[in-house]
Amino acid sequence: DQNFPPMGFVGDDGEYTGFDLELAQEVAKRLGLEYKAQPIAWDSKDMELESGNIDCIWNGFTMTGREDDYTWTEPYMANQQVFVVANDSDINSQADLAGKIVEVQADSSAEAALKEAPELTATFKELLTTADYNTAFMDLEQGAVDAIAMDVIVAGYQIQQRNADFKILDDSLSEEEYGVGFKKGNTELRDK
């Protein structure tokens, strides 16, 4: 997903960059492997991996809830799923999301966490999905949605880069860890 800053995104120079991409490049260099950044549509990640178009998924990839679906590395980063709202909104906790429109990236960890919280989502006026978080932030800026559910790492970066008047709610939706996911059973590449 090339729209997941600061983990992976297209920089001002038009090149792919980000924490995970730089980490992957360094690991490949140290292991003597070829590094190639391959942008994919996030909701097609399983098909891309199964077809062999990509060798691994390494871009803010949440292990939690997917432990049996991939062959994983050890976790390398802790993360949370949170809600982002406008600073001037009356939303200060998850309870305040009742009757509000919430947006989330399709096939994301935040969407999975929301599916695990039906008692919360039942209170929303509407739960919308979008292809990427850049669109979600534009929707929040324009008042089309009241909140975004997303990774805290990405939320903090987006708020800082946009110099936006947003806040992250204190009560998180879920706790999780990032890892590198390989096709189920591909221990050979993982163990290099």
Language model region names:
Residues G8-D12, A95-D96, D139:
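Short acidic, glycine/proline-rich loop/turn micro-motifs
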Residues G8-D13, A24-L33, A110-A131, I159-N163:
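Ligand-binding cleft/hinge of the Venus flytrap
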Residues L21, Q25, K29, E34-D96, ...:
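Acidic, polar ligand-binding/catalytic clefts
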Residues D1-F4, Q38-D43, G52-T64, N87, ...:
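Beta->alpha turn/N-cap motifs
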Residues L21-R30, D88-I91, A95-I101, A106-S109, ...:
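Extended ligand-binding regions for polar small-molecule ligands
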Residues M77-V85, V152-D191:
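Periplasmic-binding protein-like
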Residues D43-M47, G60-D69, A113-P118, D139-E175:
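A ligand-binding cleft/hinge motif common to bilobed small-molecule-binding domains
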Residues D1-G18:
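Short glycine-rich His-centered loop
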